[in-house]
């Protein structure tokens, strides 16, 4: 083995060690909502969920917190009417569609709907809903689509919070954006992540 090969192996070994040393803490730390750009949006109130500081990056939804893990153990669910703390008629319109779409997607996920006495109670809030401006519509693209930002709290029958979700998405209309968002929220509820 020549001297050049020994140096190459040594340099590569040191580089891999340094990479492992510096990359592992960054990979181990979960990204939290409070440290994200989403938390800094001035026009998107963060006043509905009890624990914004515990939200972490989710698999199906943007930000999630499930203190006890998966919610699959709950079989019956009651969905309350959604509220809105976002500004404008778009947020009100999105909140009006929330309950129906949440029920639809939870039912598809295998939950049984109940009017009262359910094992799981879902409350929702629309913190932002928007229609793109005329310029965006002319230029097109995904950013030209309407969107919605919503939050969901899941409580057990005793009122204990068992899940919190904050999620934003887009669609061809505000209603479509609400449906898309709540489909992903229902998947997050079912998976517990």
Predicted region positions:
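Bacterial N-terminal signal peptides that target proteins for export
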Residues: 2-13
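Generic solvent-exposed, charged/amphipathic alpha-helical segments
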Residues: 99-107, 182, 186
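Compositionally biased, intrinsically disordered linkers/stalks adjacent to structured regions
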Residues: 174-193
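Bacterial N-terminal signal peptides
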Residues: 12-21
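N-terminal signal peptide c-region/cleavage motif recognized by signal peptidases
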Residues: 23-25
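Structural recognition of the beta-strand scaffold that forms the well-ordered cores
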Residues: 78-79, 162-164
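Surface-exposed short loop/turn segments
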Residues: 31, 104, 108-160, 166-168, ...
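A structural "domain/chain start" motif
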Residues: 27-100, 193
């Amino acid at each position: 083995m020549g001297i050049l090969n020994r140096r190459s192996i040594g340099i590569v070994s040191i580089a891999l060690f340094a990479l492992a040393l510096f990359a592992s803490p960054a990979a181990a730390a979960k990204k939290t909502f409070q440290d994200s750009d989403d938390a800094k949006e001035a026009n998107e109130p963060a006043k509905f969920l009890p624990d914004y500081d515990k939200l972490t990056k989710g698999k199906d939804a943007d930000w999630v917190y499930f203190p006890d893990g998966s919610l699959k153990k709950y079989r019956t669910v009651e969905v309350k009417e959604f509220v809105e703390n976002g500004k404008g008629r778009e947020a009100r319109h999105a909140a009006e569609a929330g309950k129906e779409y949440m029920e639809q997607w939870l039912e598809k996920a295998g939950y049984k709907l109940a009017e009262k006495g359910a094992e799981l109670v879902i409350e929702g809030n629309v913190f932002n809903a928007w229609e793109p401006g005329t310029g965006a519509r002319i230029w097109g693209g995904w950013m030209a689509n309407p969107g919605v930002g919503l939050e969901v709290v899941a409580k057990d029958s005793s009122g204990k919070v068992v899940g919190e979700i904050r999620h934003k998405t887009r669609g061809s209309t505000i209603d479509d954006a609400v449906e898309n968002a709540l489909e992903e929220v229902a998947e997050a509820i079912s998976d517990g992540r």
